[in-house]
């Protein structure tokens, strides 16, 4: 399936441009936008208000250093991430991720789903 609505297709194109190299995030946004097509067709005011553009852009994203000492007494340094998409209806969902394989695209994917 692909995005047929012109407005949603433009939003998706912008997401890809603004978030290059984040295929997991692109996939999550594509799936959500495809599911929203009937809603957007019935509610053109959502486009006028830029609703979807606001949904797909995180309110904030934090990356931070986590230093810890392993069992051998050696200090390890990892990067932690937190992404927050939308607080309009209450607290943010999501959590913190510290695994070395995690990067911003994965965090956005997890936070957006």
Locations of the language-model features?
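N-terminal ligand-binding/catalytic initiation module
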Residues: 1-113
């Amino acid at each position: 399936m692909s995005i047929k609505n012109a407005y949603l297709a433009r939003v998706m194109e912008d997401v890809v441009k603004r978030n290059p190299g984040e295929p997991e995030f692109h996939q999550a946004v594509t799936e959500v936008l495809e599911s929203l097509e009937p809603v957007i067709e019935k509610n053109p005011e959502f486009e006028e208000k830029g609703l979807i553009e606001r949904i797909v852009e995180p309110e904030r994203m934090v990356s931070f250093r986590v230093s810890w000492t392993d069992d051998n007494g050696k200090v390890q340094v990892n990067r932690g991430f937190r992404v927050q998409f939308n607080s309009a209806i209450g607290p943010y969902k999501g959590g913190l991720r510290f695994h070395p394989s995690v990067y911003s695209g994965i965090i956005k994917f997890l936070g957006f789903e």
